[in-house]
C-alpha cells in the first residue's frame, strides 16, 4: 500500500510565513527528489487562510489538506468553512475528529458524522483521528476506546476512501512517541476490525528520526505529523526517510 505523510500545522504560521515555508521546501524537494520514493503521497494542512498558497508550490506532488470543515452544507453559519469551499480550492484531504477539537471544542460523534458526510459529498478524503488518553492507555483500554470511536462513525464512513489516523493523546506534542511496536499493534488491530485494506496512519511526536521505523511496520501506512512539519527542511527529511 502507498504511504502518505500529512503535515498538520494546527494554528501556526501567517500567510507570509507560509510563503517562506513553501519557497524553502520547494528548494529542499528539488535537491532531494531522487531520495524520495516515487509512490509516496504527501500533503500539508495549514490554516484556512493559507490553504490556497499550498497550490502555488512548485512541488506539484504536494497536496492540500484542511484541518477542519463545517458539518453544514451552506447558509447562515458565521465563521464556518464548507466542504464545497474546500473542494473548489483543490483540497484533497480533511482532518476530522482530532483530539484537540474533541476536547477543546467539544465535538461529539453526531457532529463528526455530519462532517464526514460533508467531506464525502465533495470528494474530500476524511482523515479520521482516534486515540486514547494516558489513563486509558495505562489501564489497558486502548483497544476498547479506539474501536468505540470508530464504531461511532462507521455507518457513514466509506473506509475505502478514507484514512484512519491513530494519534494517542498522550503522545501529541509531548515528545513522547508510542514505540513502533505499540503503534503497529494498534494500527494492526484497526485493520483487523475494520478491513485489512483500510489506510491507517500514525501520529504523535513524529519526526525525521523516528519516521522510518514507524512506516516500516506492516500495518502503518504513513504519518500525521505535527510540530515537525512546521520546518521545511525537517518535513522534507521526513519524506526522504519514509
UniProtKB/Swiss-Prot annotation:
It is an enzyme of class 5 (isomerase). Pathway: Carbohydrate biosynthesis; gluconeogenesis; Carbohydrate degradation; glycolysis; D-glyceraldehyde 3-phosphate from glycerone phosphate: step 1/1. This is Triosephosphate isomerase. One of its GO terms (molecular function) is triose-phosphate isomerase activity. Belongs to the triosephosphate isomerase family. It is found in: Cytoplasm. Pfam families: TIM. Homodimer. InterPro entries: Aldolase_TIM, TIM_sf, TrioseP_Isoase_bac/euk, Triosephosphate_isomerase, Triosephosphate_isomerase_AS. It comes from Mesomycoplasma hyopneumoniae (strain 7448) (Mycoplasma hyopneumoniae). GO terms for cellular component: cytosol.
Amino acid at each position: 500500500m502507498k504511504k502518505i505523510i500529512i503535515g498538520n500545522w494546527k494554528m501556526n504560521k501567517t500567510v507570509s510565513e507560509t510563503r517562506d515555508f513553501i519557497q524553502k521546501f520547494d528548494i529542499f524537494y528539488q535537491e532531494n527528489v531522487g531520495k524520495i520514493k516515487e509512490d509516496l503521497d504527501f500533503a500539508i494542512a495549514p490554516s484556512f487562510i493559507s490553504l490556497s498558497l499550498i497550490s502555488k508550490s512548485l512541488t506539484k506532488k504536494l497536496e492540500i489538506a484542511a484541518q477542519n470543515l463545517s458539518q453544514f452544507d451552506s447558509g447562515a453559519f458565521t465563521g464556518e468553512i464548507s466542504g464545497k469551499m474546500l473542494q473548489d480550492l483543490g483540497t484533497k484531504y480533511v482532518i476530522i475528529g482530532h483530539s484537540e477539537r474533541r476536547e477543546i471544542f467539544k465535538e461529539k460523534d453526531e457532529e463528526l458524522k455530519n462532517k464526514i458526510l460533508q467531506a464525502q459529498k465533495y470528494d474530500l478524503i476524511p482523515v479520521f483521528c482516534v486515540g486514547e488518553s494516558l489513563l486509558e492507555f495505562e489501564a489497558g483500554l486502548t483497544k476498547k476506546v479506539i474501536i468505540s470511536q470508530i464504531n461511532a462513525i462507521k455507518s457513514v464512513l466509506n473506509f475505502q476512501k478514507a484514512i484512519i489516523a491513530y494519534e494517542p493523546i498522550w503522545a501529541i506534542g509531548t515528545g513522547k512517541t508510542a514505540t513502533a511496536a505499540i503503534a503497529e499493534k494498534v494500527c494492526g488491530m484497526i485493520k483487523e476490525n475494520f478491513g485489512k485494506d483500510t489506510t491507517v496512519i500514525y501520529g504523535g511526536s513524529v519526526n525525521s528520526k523516528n519516521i522510518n521505523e514507524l512506516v516500516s511496520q506492516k500495518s502503518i501506512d504513513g504519518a500525521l505529523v505535527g510540530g515537525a512539519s512546521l520546518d521545511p527542511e525537517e518535513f522534507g527529511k521526513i519524506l526522504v526517510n519514509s
